[in-house]
């Protein structure tokens, strides 16, 4: 019933050292899908969380970096250097040296959400790290 978005990964399987053309995105909305996700539940609504308290989030990985945005108002964004920090212990989102990269990843994630027509793309809560 919902449109699926995909990329052909066969070039990566044929040559694991080849580079992905597009970033990888994961959208976690628990067990809620499609048009029902147009309205993001409030922070105190159990529908926002899945399993052991994991909220809705958007993750975008490209190259050595991974960006995570929890869909809770005033929640901090996350940015990790997966080469230097594969366990994702050091959040670079507040590091001034990575400010431009954070803005770039934020914009790429929003662009990809609009491209794939994610119903909640226009209603995302403002993160605490947004300084624009």
Q: Where are the regions a protein language model picked out?
A:
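Intrinsically disordered, low-complexity polar regions and short flexible loop motifs
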Residues: 85
């Amino acid at each position: 019933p919902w449109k699926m978005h995909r990329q052909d990964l066969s070039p990566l399987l044929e040559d694991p050292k080849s580079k992905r053309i597009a970033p990888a995105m994961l959208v976690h909305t628990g067990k809620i899908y499609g048009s029902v996700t147009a309205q993001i539940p409030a922070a105190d609504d159990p529908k926002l969380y899945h399993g052991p308290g994991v909220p809705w989030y958007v993750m975008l990985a490209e190259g050595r970096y991974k960006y995570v945005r929890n869909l809770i108002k005033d929640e901090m964004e996350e940015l990790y250097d997966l080469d230097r920090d594969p366990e994702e212990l050091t959040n670079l989102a507040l590091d001034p040296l990575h400010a431009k990269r954070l803005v770039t990843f934020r914009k790429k994630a929003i662009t990809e959400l609009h491209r794939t027509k994610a119903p909640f793309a226009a209603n995302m809560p403002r993160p605490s790290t947004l300084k624009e």
